[in-house]
């Protein structure tokens, strides 16, 4: 099935934009550097390529315009006549013809100048021929600028046309202006057509969709039609006439019996008789609208006779319709009869389409494939299926034993219906006691999710955990008391008790001052007036505990900061008794000076590769490996001159290949 989607037509540029597009593409897609020292064949090929490429681009763009715009003779007659009404078929064809002529002229110009370029004997002549060829092509295109502008306006208007499928199931609404056509369409479809209390609110075709018996129907709202000669009708009315003439649809002729539209029933009947030829072989329904303002019983006898004449004419044009299906009444204000009108029109249209298909030749090919076999009785004896009695009894027992489980819907109907019966969502909970089902359990308690702590065996698990903790604590106490206290003397026992007391006091003080100790800064000696942080005091306290303070004191001295100048210059001045010792000490001082100048560290600081106790390295090899890995991780950051790992600044990038060889006058615009 052909899909008419005019929104896919490519935008048509005007003459100046067209030239800019083509020449810019030629400049970008073809070589731009040529020298007079090249061979003449190379020069000819260079400029011939530009002319051919430009002609190819012109041909492709113009061909796309010609091919994408619909040809009125090849599309559905409805769209052909609609486009003729809207845009004038002669002007439309003339514009496309001028585009086609321009395409042929450009091809001819390219062919002529390529032939001339074959005989070019210098770079200057070849270039002049190229300029002349491209100039003539652009001149031809600029001459059709009005046609291109006209086609662009047509393209924009066609993109706004509704997507009407001429071959699908269609319901067409027609009648005088302001009789309620758009209001009915808004009721039966999801379309949002503007409705106003004045005539000719609808100025073009509008499409909506509705469903009937699981089938999709398109509903077309047409502009109002006036009763006047065909030659006097305007474009708005001709859109309605075109739709009535070419679409195989169910027609709803709206009749305003109240006269509020500004036209009497006699005028509306005259319009019906003037266009009744367009209703031939189509399901026709006469809809008497606005019955809320004027009921059918209150109209005059003359108007009633006119309506009866219209109904009799509709019976002649319609195919196999009854009187009830031809004349219907409704009110879009109160929604009375709206759905009955829609259903009657859809049913009439469906019956007509089925009947038309049954009369076609293709249906015979399908009907021959169907065969319904009906067995004929050979006698009057009734032969029932033979089922054993045991099977019947078993099925009866199963049916009796199988009780239907009552659902919440059944319980609701038994207990008073909706609003009276309240279903309990907790009655099927599986708990240890039934009285627990209706307990109110919070979701959050003391900042914790209650569901995380729900466990049926929580009490049993708690008892097991307490028993294990008791066994473990008892084992620890026994292990602590395993010391052979009997082997210790009285003096040793006294020292042991003092050590334990001091240890407990230290632990307690450490816990109290933990946060303070972590944030404490290094205290210089001159501010340590109470002599709290000295190695002598540390040695006395460790000796009082019974520990050897020598290793701790050596480590403290190695970590302490000394005087740099004394360590570097005067370290070798003590105990110099012999000249040889003086010479060796002098060399050591020189080495110490150079090392201090190179790495800027004091003599008390150990070398970088030397392992200091407490650093966590096994030997100097492992420490050097760790230092290398650390330095390697900093390379990427240092290479990009980052301030740190969080530095994500991207500086202004000015790549050289994009900024070199560019001057304002364009003298050196080549790289």
Curated annotation (Swiss-Prot):
<dbReference type="InterPro" id="IPR024926">
    <property type="entry name" value="NOG1"/>
</dbReference>
<dbReference type="InterPro" id="IPR031167">
    <property type="entry name" value="G_OBG"/>
</dbReference>
<comment type="similarity">
    <text>Belongs to the TRAFAC class OBG-HflX-like GTPase superfamily. OBG GTPase family. NOG subfamily.</text>
</comment>
<dbReference type="Pfam" id="PF08155">
    <property type="entry name" value="NOGCT"/>
</dbReference>
<feature type="binding site">
    <location>
        <begin position="289"/>
        <end position="292"/>
    </location>
    <ligand>
        <name>GTP</name>
    </ligand>
</feature>
<feature type="compositionally biased region" description="Basic residues">
    <location>
        <begin position="631"/>
        <end position="640"/>
    </location>
</feature>
<keyword id="KW-0690">Ribosome biogenesis</keyword>
<feature type="binding site">
    <location>
        <begin position="175"/>
        <end position="182"/>
    </location>
    <ligand>
        <name>GTP</name>
    </ligand>
</feature>
<feature type="region of interest" description="Disordered">
    <location>
        <begin position="516"/>
        <end position="671"/>
    </location>
</feature>
<dbReference type="InterPro" id="IPR010674">
    <property type="entry name" value="NOG1_Rossman_fold_dom"/>
</dbReference>
<feature type="compositionally biased region" description="Basic residues">
    <location>
        <begin position="654"/>
        <end position="671"/>
    </location>
</feature>
<dbReference type="InterPro" id="IPR041623">
    <property type="entry name" value="NOG1_N"/>
</dbReference>
<keyword id="KW-0539">Nucleus</keyword>
<dbReference type="Pfam" id="PF17835">
    <property type="entry name" value="NOG1_N"/>
</dbReference>
<dbReference type="GO" id="GO:0042254">
    <property type="term" value="P:ribosome biogenesis"/>
</dbReference>
<keyword id="KW-0342">GTP-binding</keyword>
<keyword id="KW-0547">Nucleotide-binding</keyword>
<dbReference type="InterPro" id="IPR027417">
    <property type="entry name" value="P-loop_NTPase"/>
</dbReference>
<protein>
    <recommendedName>
        <fullName>Nucleolar GTP-binding protein 1</fullName>
    </recommendedName>
</protein>
<dbReference type="InterPro" id="IPR006073">
    <property type="entry name" value="GTP-bd"/>
</dbReference>
<dbReference type="GO" id="GO:0005525">
    <property type="term" value="F:GTP binding"/>
</dbReference>
<feature type="domain" description="OBG-type G">
    <location>
        <begin position="169"/>
        <end position="350"/>
    </location>
</feature>
<dbReference type="GO" id="GO:0003729">
    <property type="term" value="F:mRNA binding"/>
</dbReference>
<dbReference type="Pfam" id="PF06858">
    <property type="entry name" value="NOG1"/>
</dbReference>
<feature type="compositionally biased region" description="Polar residues">
    <location>
        <begin position="595"/>
        <end position="605"/>
    </location>
</feature>
<dbReference type="InterPro" id="IPR012973">
    <property type="entry name" value="NOG_C"/>
</dbReference>
<comment type="function">
    <text>Involved in the biogenesis of the 60S ribosomal subunit.</text>
</comment>
<dbReference type="GO" id="GO:0005730">
    <property type="term" value="C:nucleolus"/>
</dbReference>
<feature type="binding site">
    <location>
        <begin position="221"/>
        <end position="225"/>
    </location>
    <ligand>
        <name>GTP</name>
    </ligand>
</feature>
């Amino acid at each position: 099935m052909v899909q008419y989607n005019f929104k896919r037509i490519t935008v048509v540029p005007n003459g100046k934009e067209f030239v800019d597009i083509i020449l810019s593409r030629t400049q970008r897609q073809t070589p731009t550097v040529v020298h007079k020292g090249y061979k003449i064949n190379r020069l000819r090929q260079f400029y011939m390529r530009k002319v051919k490429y430009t002609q190819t681009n012109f041909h492709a763009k113009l061909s796309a315009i010609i091919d994408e715009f619909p040809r009125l003779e090849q599309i559905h007659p409805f769209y052909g006549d609609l486009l003729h009404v809207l845009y004038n078929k002669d002007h439309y064809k003339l514009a496309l013809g001028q585009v086609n002529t321009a395409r042929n002229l450009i091809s001819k110009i390219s062919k002529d100048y390529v032939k001339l370029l074959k005989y070019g004997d210098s770079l200057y002549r070849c270039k002049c021929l190229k300029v002349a060829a491209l100039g003539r092509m652009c001149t031809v295109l600029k001459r059709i600028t009005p046609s291109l502008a006209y086609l662009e306006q047509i393209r924009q208007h066609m993109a706004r046309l509704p997507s009407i499928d001429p071959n699908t199931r269609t319901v067409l609404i027609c009648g005088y202006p302001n009789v309620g056509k758009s209001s009915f369409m808004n009721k039966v479809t999801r379309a949002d057509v503007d409705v106003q209390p004045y005539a000719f609110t609808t100025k073009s075709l509008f499409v909506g969709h509705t469903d009937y018996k699981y089938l999709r129907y398109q509903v077309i709202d047409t502009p109002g039609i006036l009763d006047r000669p065909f030659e006097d009708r305007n474009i708005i009315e001709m859109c309605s006439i075109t739709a009535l003439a070419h679409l195989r649809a169910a027609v709803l002729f709206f009749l305003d019996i109240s006269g509020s539209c500004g036209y009497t029933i006699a005028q509306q009947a005259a319009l019906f008789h003037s266009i009744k030829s367009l209703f031939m072989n189509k399901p026709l329904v006469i809809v008497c609208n606005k019955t809320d303002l004027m009921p059918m019983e209150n109209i005059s006898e003359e108007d009633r006779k006119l309506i009866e004449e219209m109904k009799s004419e509709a019976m002649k044009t319609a195919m196999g319709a009854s009187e009830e299906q031809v004349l219907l009444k409704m009110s879009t204000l109160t929604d009375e009869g709206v759905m009955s009108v829609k259903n009657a029109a859809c049913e009439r249209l469906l019956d007509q389409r089925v009947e038309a298909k049954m009369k076609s030749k293709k249906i015979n090919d399908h009907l021959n494939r169907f065969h319904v076999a009906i067995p004929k009785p050979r006698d009057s004896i009734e032969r029932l299926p033979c089922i054993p009695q045991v099977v019947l009894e078993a099925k009866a027992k199963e049916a009796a034993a199988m009780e239907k489980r009552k659902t919440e819907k059944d319980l609701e109907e038994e207990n008073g219906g909706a609003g009276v019966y309240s279903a309990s969502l907790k009655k099927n909970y599986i708990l240890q006691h039934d009285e627990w089902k209706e307990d109110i359990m919070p979701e959050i308690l003391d900042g914790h999710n209650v569901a995380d702590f729900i466990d049926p065996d929580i009490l049993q698990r708690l008892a097991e955990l307490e028993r294990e903790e008791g066994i473990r604590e008892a084992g620890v106490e026994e292990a602590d008391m395993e010391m052979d206290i009997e082997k210790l003397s009285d003096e040793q026992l006294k020292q042991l008790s003092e050590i334990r007391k001091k240890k407990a006091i230290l632990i307690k003080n450490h816990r109290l001052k933990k946060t303070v100790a972590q944030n404490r800064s290094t205290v210089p000696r001159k501010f340590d007036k109470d002599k709290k942080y000295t190695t002598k005091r540390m040695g006395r306290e460790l000796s009082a505990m019974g520990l050897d303070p020598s290793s701790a004191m050596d480590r403290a001295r190695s970590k302490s900061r000394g005087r740099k100048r004394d360590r570097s210059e005067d370290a070798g001045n003590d105990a110099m008794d012999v000249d040889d010792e003086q010479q060796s000490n002098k060399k050591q001082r020189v080495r110490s000076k150079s090392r201090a100048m190179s790495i800027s560290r004091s003599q008390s600081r150990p070398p970088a590769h030397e392992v200091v106790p407490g650093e966590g390295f096994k030997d100097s090899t492992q420490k050097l490996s760790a230092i290398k890995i650390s330095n390697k991780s900093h390379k990427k950051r240092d290479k990009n001159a980052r301030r740190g790992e969080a530095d994500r600044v991207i500086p202004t990038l000015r790549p050289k290949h994009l900024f070199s060889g560019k001057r304002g006058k364009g003298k050196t615009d080549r790289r």
